[in-house]
Amino acid sequence: MKRTFQPNNRKRKKVHGFRARMSTKNGRNVLARRRRKGRKVLSA
């Protein structure tokens, strides 16, 4: 059986990266929420 996690750094950045988050209103909400919570790492 194929594993569900097939690592790919390009896809990782495109989907979960900082610039991807900043590009949409909801993504910015995610970053704001993580800042408020005090996360050391905001995005991939």
Swiss-Prot record:
It comes from the Bacteria. One of its GO terms (cellular component) is ribonucleoprotein complex. The keyword Ribonucleoprotein applies. GO terms for biological process: translation. Coiled coil: none annotated. Residues 1-44 are annotated as: Disordered. It holds the Pfam family Ribosomal_L34. GO terms for molecular function: structural constituent of ribosome. Signal peptide: none annotated. Residues 1-19, 31-44 have a biased composition (Basic residues). Gene3D superfamilies: 1.10.287.3980. Keywords: Ribonucleoprotein, Ribosomal protein. NCBIfam families: rpmH_bact. Belongs to the bacterial ribosomal protein bL34 family. This is Large ribosomal subunit protein bL34. It comes from Oceanobacillus iheyensis (strain DSM 14371 / CIP 107618 / JCM 11309 / KCTC 3954 / HTE831).
